[in-house]
């Protein structure tokens, strides 16, 4: 087969990469680790950085560099929007560690609206985004079956976050609410919306009914894809249910799963190091504080396989459904 033309500079860049990789491999195992694991990681980092330099010189893509970086993208989430100036400073600071941020939609168990209307501002700053919808939770209680009148009163109250609202019917209704809110914020079709499911020692069937119906409704509607934020303690069971819903809907994709667990966390690890191959995001530091650009924020720290966890894998030509037609 004929070889594609390669510019002389590209050939020299490739030779440089190969040369450095060869030197690193020649060093073999080192005292940094009995099996050379740390050394091999450093070799990969060096080679990836060289590939980036070569890409900049030649104008070509650097898949090795991209693969090395895309699997370990640090991000953070915090309850209340920190403000435009803070977000700009955190993104522009030299050596700024975070590439993406959680974007909270108004939802039953997160009624704060401080993030509303900030999508384009954050995108313009260069932030990746993870859309979060905090649905109904158990809060350590066993859900009770309510009358239609009592259910309506809870839904219309100023505090519509209640374990007794964990039903399939409420899951569908909250899914429509999530679709409408995501569309209103201007997120493109097939963006992933992460349903926040907090830790449960024992998961009641009512919770499975709720998130199952929520997931099914998003898949059925088709404008956005369902993802899930879940604690490691419940992750396998939730993943199995959500994966089954994808299969039943004929959606040949892996659901995006965001797993929370502080155990074994170190910056530099990949999401899958939380203990599940299906984990695409890992929240490893919870209720902490970090300082960037001399500005301190309360936050959780995460690592993601994607620079922007809610971005669809492939650009879509699906038309955006206006919010007033979401239920159709």
Task: Kindly label every feature range from the protein language model.
Residues 139-146, 234-246:
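Glycine-rich, charge-decorated loop segments at or immediately adjacent to ligand/cofactor-binding or catalytic sites
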Residues 57-210, 220:
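Substrate-binding cleft of extracellular glycoside hydrolase catalytic domains
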Residues 24-50, 54-58:
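C-terminal region of N-terminal signal peptides and the immediate post-cleavage residues
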Residues 50-82, 87-88, 242-328:
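Functionally critical loop-and-helix segments that line ligand-binding/catalytic clefts
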Residues 3-31:
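Secretory targeting and sorting signals
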